[in-house]
Amino acid sequence: MVNVPTAVWIDERGRIVRPNEVAFIDDRFKTFTGMDSAPYIDAIRDWAAKGAKSVYALSEAELKARLKPRSDERSRADAEFALAEYLYKQGKGADAIPHFKEAQRLDPDNWNYKRQAWALSDAERDYGTSFGKEVKKLNGKPYYEPRKLPAAVARP
């Protein structure tokens, strides 16, 4: 998951029917992201009403095509991040920083790693950056991957 708010749709059988994607339920971030919340809300309502027959519920083949394989770097990043969190919770914040940095290096697109680390210390001092600076570095690249929803379904 890139950042909050994201969601994974899981049906009553425990099966994932949509992978993680940005999940705005209102338009408070529309000027920042350019994403309208209405199509996503309509999709949720359609799925809630129609279940597996909803055009928004993905088949197993569609789901597999969208899921990204887990790389060795991502697995190592998860381990580094977990170690950093552990050290921080043990009162060893300074010892955690190199592990937070390594997690970010190994999985540079993971904003969860960045934002968590920056919130636990002085981001400018310890990481030489801030959330605002990193967003500016995107230089127009979407912060959130655009949703892949089918064309709007006519309302009854």
Language model feature labels by segment:
Residues 3-92, 121:
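Thiol-/selenol-based redox modules, centered on thioredoxin-like
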Residues 120-149:
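Alpha-helical linker/edge segments of TPR/alpha-solenoid repeat scaffolds
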Residues 74, 106-108:
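Short coil turns that delineate tetratricopeptide repeat
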Residues 31, 108-116, 128:
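Boundary/linker segments of alpha-helical solenoid repeat arrays
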Residues 122, 153-156:
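Long, low-complexity intrinsically disordered regions enriched in Ser/Thr, Asp/Glu, Pro/Gly
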